[in-house]
From Swiss-Prot:
[4Fe-4S] cluster 2 binds at residues 81, 85, 88. Keywords: 4Fe-4S, Cytoplasm, Iron, Iron-sulfur, Metal-binding, S-adenosyl-L-methionine, Transferase. [4Fe-4S] cluster 1 binds at residues 55, 60, 66, 292. It comes from Mycobacterium leprae (strain TN). Its cofactor is [4Fe-4S] cluster. One of its GO terms (molecular function) is metal ion binding. This is Lipoyl synthase. It is found in: Cytoplasm. Gene3D superfamilies: Aldolase class I. Binds 2 [4Fe-4S] clusters per subunit. One cluster is coordinated with 3 cysteines and an exchangeable S-adenosyl-L-methionine. Residues 67-281 form the Radical SAM core domain. NCBIfam families: lipA (TIGR00510), PRK05481.1 (NF004019), PRK12928.1 (NF009544). Its EC number is 2.8.1.8. It comes from the Bacteria.
Length: 314
């Protein structure tokens, strides 16, 4: 059997990554389990009716706080992604056939859990003619129809920057349209070979021009410098991006990119203050922050200070 050149390259990359042992976490990379009444009730419900959330399946350290706020995240499109990012724990491979009933099931899960706010994310589906745009848009509409008071945040891939695909997704009108840049230009191709930095910025610009509240994320500890982080934050703000989260990279396995550096908590404070100075409406940074952490609160904060459609000077 002939192995495709791209597959060979990825195998070599994973072999090289595996030469570096899993890094020992510093003392500030820890969280306390605070199991309040809302979390406990939701946990029991999820077990009783066999629901599946990214929060549990990814072992998110913030699940206690988010579930206490009645917020949860769902992954759509299957468990195989057509792209490979060197920080992501989702497997790369040939996805299963499109499940057209998935939007209904997600909407019913949101209803059953009584969520106030939900984040929907998914895998890249370059195998589909529309890149999965129908699935993302239909899931948002299904949630809104069944749960009119629930806020919906949609975290999307770039759909190869195709305007028609993006328009279909934007027309579903999520409360927040998120697309994560994740890292800085110098190492972008190494970390996210199937994406481009500028195209990701263009997706955010297009979403902002469509009148949506927009959001992105930067992962630190992949080899970036402080100046590069500040430049990337400025680039995001120039697109009109409203909300940004700044996070620490936690290596999923030895196959993934090694942790280059553990960013100290005080550095996150400095980056957060810098981002606020740039004019982001909502900023959250920290070693255990994830892009969907406190998503509902960040949206409310941004919506309260932002005028939809306002242009940002470039």
């Amino acid at each position: 059997m002939t192995v495709a050149p791209e597959d060979c390259r990825l195998l070599r990359l994973e072999v090289r990554n595996a030469q570096t042992p899993i890094e020992r976490k510093p003392p500030w990379i820890k969280t306390r389990a605070r199991m309040g009444p809302e979390y406990t009730a939701l946990k029991n419900l999820v077990r009783r009716v066999a629901l599946h959330t990214v929060c549990e399946e990814a072992g998110c350290p913030n699940i206690f706080e988010c579930w206490e706020d009645r917020e949860a995240t769902f992954l759509i499109g299957g468990d195989q992604c057509t792209r490979r990012c060197d920080f992501c724990q989702i497997d790369t491979g040939k996805p299963a056939a499109l499940d057209r009933d998935e939007p209904r099931r997600v909407a019913e899960s949101v209803q059953t859990m009584g969520l106030r706010y939900t984040t929907v994310t998914g895998v890249a589906r370059d195998d589909l003619p529309d890149g999965g745009a129908w699935l993302y848009a239909t899931t948002v509409r299904a949630i809104k129809e069944l749960n009119p008071s629930t806020g919906v945040e949609l975290l999307i891939p770039d759909f190869n920057g195709q305007p028609a695909r993006l328009a279909e997704v934007f027309d579903s009108r999520p409360q927040v349209l998120a697309h994560n840049v994740e890292t800085v230009p110098r190492i972008f191709k190494r970390i996210r070979p199937a994406f481009t930095y500028q195209r990701s910025l263009d997706v955010l610009t297009a979403a902002r021009e469509a009148g949506l509240v927009t959001k992105s994320n930067l992962i630190l500890g992949l080899g970036e410098t402080a100046d590069e982080v500040r430049t990337a934050l400025a680039d995001l703000r120039k697109t009109g991006c409203d909300i940004v989260t700044i996070t620490q990279y936690l290596r999923p396995s030895m196959r993934h990119h090694p942790v280059e550096r553990w960013v100290r908590p005080e550095e996150f404070v400095e980056y957060t203050q810098y981002a606020e100075g740039l004019g982001f409406s909502g900023v959250l940074g920290g070693p255990l922050v994830r892009s969907s952490y406190r998503a509902g609160r960040l949206y409310e904060q941004a919506a309260g200070t932002r005028t939809v459609g306002t242009s940002v000077s470039r």
